[in-house]
């Protein structure tokens, strides 16, 4: 049976752990708040730009645009996995990585060669442990992403697709509805599909012809 000294030491240990946990919660709450503010400030721009592109694309002559062409045969597929850099996030990263593995196996069964791009330390560690070498790896940017990394990856993707080296490109990530709820998203990036972006951003096809007044 523990003596009084052991009990006191145990109480101090539990109290110390509680204080550390509370501090971690406060730090996490502050980070979530800042991230939410950045997302909320950027979303109107994303919606407006996507809405404009969707509305105008059907009036442009894009029949020969390489990024809109559906390839006759799907031989090579790229899947971009987006995770966090740190753990202690429940199923946040696990759900993404398991889905990427599931999607990869589906495409392989269909006869396609699959390569992956890993965004986040958790994705990099997951693929490295399984002997999979990502074509691109980015770490340390989940809290404060930069345009340079996105431009590098998108440049590779667009060039490879236009040259016929890639036939389909998907991105898998978690869409955070709030701090407690995330929705797993699989989005086809290439070939470009209007519905993919419209559904994602909550855009609806407009009944009216926004260019009608200009043509009359």
Predicted region positions:
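C-terminal beta-strand-loop-alpha-helix "lid" module of Rossmann-like NAD(P)-dependent dehydrogenases
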Residues: 1-216
């Amino acid at each position: 049976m523990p003596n009084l000294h052991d009990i006191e030491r145990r109480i101090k240990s539990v109290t110390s752990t509680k204080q550390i946990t509370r501090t971690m919660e406060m730090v996490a709450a502050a980070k979530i708040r800042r991230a939410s503010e950045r997302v909320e400030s950027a979303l109107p721009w994303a919606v407006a730009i996507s809405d404009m592109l969707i509305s105008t694309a059907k009036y442009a002559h894009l029949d020969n645009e390489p990024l809109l062409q559906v390839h006759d045969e799907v031989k090579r597929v790229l899947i971009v996995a987006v995770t966090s850099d740190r753990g202690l996030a429940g199923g946040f990263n696990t759900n993404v990585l398991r889905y990427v593995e599931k999607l990869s196996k589906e495409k392989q069964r269909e006869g396609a060669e699959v390569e992956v791009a890993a965004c986040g330390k958790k994705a990099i560690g997951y693929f490295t442990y399984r002997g999979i070498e990502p074509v691109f790896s980015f770490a340390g940017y989940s809290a404060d992403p930069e345009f340079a990394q996105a431009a590098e990856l998108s440049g590779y993707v667009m060039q490879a697709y236009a040259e016929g080296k890639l036939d389909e490109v998907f991105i898998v990530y978690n869409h955070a509805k709030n701090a407690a709820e995330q929705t797993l998203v699989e989005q086809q990036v290439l070939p470009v599909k209007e519905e993919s972006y419209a559904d994602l951003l909550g855009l609806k096809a407009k009944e009216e012809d926004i260019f009608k007044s200009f043509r009359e």
